[in-house]
């Protein structure tokens, strides 16, 4: 991925936050017929540097890839169109053009298949706990009949991606003046695009902390 230095995201906590906030990753694999991409919700095990997930047994991805095959998982964070009209300097110089701001994390690693009940049951339970946490009465696997759950688990296969390296990019108008960035963030808030607005404002706080050190 092309990452200019001023757009490089190096803060590990910020990278983890994107993966956890936008867990639907794109698993890119190389097959005999070419590149393949599958959209899968992942769980990050930060201590082990591993991504865990499951796929349908009918999905050929787990059979097409050899154990330890090199793969790429892409996580897209907040993103938004940015109009030059939002920048005060545009109205002074008329030398700005539209752009697109975004956050993205590329996780490189090696794929291993975990086709056994303990792994599959564990990853399903953990993903469920995380994503049901905001519900008034969170659903849990024990809410369904054991035989039904057993049948569902047999229809999926577990996978892990052992992380080898991570590239992360946050294009948040860092190449613009402070007043331009602040104005763009305000316009995004007005348009209900809080995720990108908050990301840009969080970047400003990071700069402020750095200036005080």
Language-model segments: what does each one mean?
Residues 1-213:
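Binding-site signature for planar aromatic cofactors or substrates
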């Amino acid at each position: 991925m092309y990452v200019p230095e001023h757009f490089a995201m190096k803060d590990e906590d910020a990278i983890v936050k994107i993966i956890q906030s936008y867990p639907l990753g794109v698993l890119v694999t190389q097959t005999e017929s070419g590149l393949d991409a599958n959209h899968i919700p992942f769980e990050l095990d930060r201590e082990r540097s591993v991504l865990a997930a499951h796929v349908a047994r009918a999905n050929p991805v787990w059979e097409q890839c050899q154990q330890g095959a090199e793969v790429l998982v892409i996580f897209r964070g907040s993103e938004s169109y940015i109009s030059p009209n939002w920048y005060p300097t545009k109205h002074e110089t008329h030398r700005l053009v539209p752009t697109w701001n975004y956050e993205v994390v590329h996780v490189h690693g090696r794929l291993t298949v975990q086709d056994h009940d303990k792994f599959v049951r564990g990853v399903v339970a953990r993903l469920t706990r995380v994503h049901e946490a905001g519900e008034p009465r969170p659903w849990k696997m024990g809410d369904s009949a054991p035989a039904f759950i057993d049948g569902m688990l047999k229809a999926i296969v577990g996978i892990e991606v052992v992380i080898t390296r991570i590239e992360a990019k946050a294009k948040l108008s860092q190449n613009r003046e402070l007043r331009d960035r602040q104005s763009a963030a305000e316009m995004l808030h007005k348009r209900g695009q809080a995720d990108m607005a908050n990301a840009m404002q969080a970047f400003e706080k990071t700069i402020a902390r750095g200036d005080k050190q």
